[in-house]
Design a protein with these regions (language model features):
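ATP-dependent adenylation/nucleotidyltransferase module used to activate substrates
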Residues: 1-128
Length: 128
């Protein structure tokens, strides 16, 4: 859950469908205050538990710097991959069978391909 419209709407719909979702938040420590307030408001309003993973800033900053130096267009690939992994980690930890994601639909499907190896390669070549 990011606190933006897409993930907030997904929580609302999941509750409407009679599901008992767990909101999972990947905190890269760059949250806008409105996002933090929205997460609290949505989870409280719909009675949804929240599980948050906070990044190790030293590692995350090293990776982000490498992406800046690489000049690649997938600047947030590291965050996207980390978010997917955090959702899978939460699902395993709490024995959750299904993962629901809300997306804005802004990025065209198939416009990017990246995986953990891509992030690791950029980090190895360009990080401190």
């Amino acid at each position: 859950m990011s606190g933006d419209t897409d993930s907030s709407y997904m929580i609302m719909k999941a509750v409407d469908w009679g599901l008992r979702p767990l909101a999972v938040h990947y905190d890269n420590t760059w949250n806008a205050s409105t996002a933090t307030m929205n997460i609290a408001r949505v989870t409280k309003t719909f009675g949804v538990d929240l599980w948050t993973h906070v990044v190790n800033n030293e590692v995350a900053d090293d990776i982000k710097k490498a992406f800046l130096l690489a000049g690649v267009r997938e600047f947030d690939a590291d965050t996207d991959i980390a978010l997917a992994q955090v959702m899978r980690t939460a699902a395993a930890k709490f024995s959750i069978k299904y993962i629901l994601e809300g997306h804005s639909g802004i990025s065209p499907i198939g416009s990017n391909y990246f995986d953990g190896g891509y992030v690791e390669d950029i980090q190895k070549k360009l990080a401190n």
